[in-house]
Amino acid sequence: MKVTLIAILTCAAVLVLHTTAAEEFEAESQLMEVGMPDTELAAVDEERLFECSVSCEIEKEGNKDCKKKKCKGGWKCKFNMCVKV
């Protein structure tokens, strides 16, 4: 009886550890996939590019000096566009 109980508990522990390891591996493999589009980052990139170029055009139309908006977070404004530094 004790041997059966120990065998069942051992199998249950192995199953739990195997399932946890498989879930971690799946999560890591999804993060490591190359070519998988990240729509949130793409949207941020488009917003930054749009924000920099539009702000400059608006200031030119108002007969004011073109003061480029400062792009933050490793970006800089160049040719009226935010570019990654």
Curated annotation (Swiss-Prot):
It comes from the Eukaryota. InterPro entries: Hwtx-2-like. Expressed by the venom gland. Pfam families: Toxin_20. It is found in: Secreted. Residues 1-22 form the signal peptide. Coiled coil: none annotated. Residues 23-48 form a propeptide. One of its GO terms (cellular component) is host cell postsynaptic membrane. Disulfide bonds join C52-C66, C56-C77, C71-C82. Belongs to the neurotoxin 12 (Hwtx-2) family. 02 (Hwtx-2) subfamily. Monomer. Neurotoxin active on both insects and mammals. This is U4-theraphotoxin-Hhn1a. It comes from Cyriopagopus hainanus (Chinese bird spider).
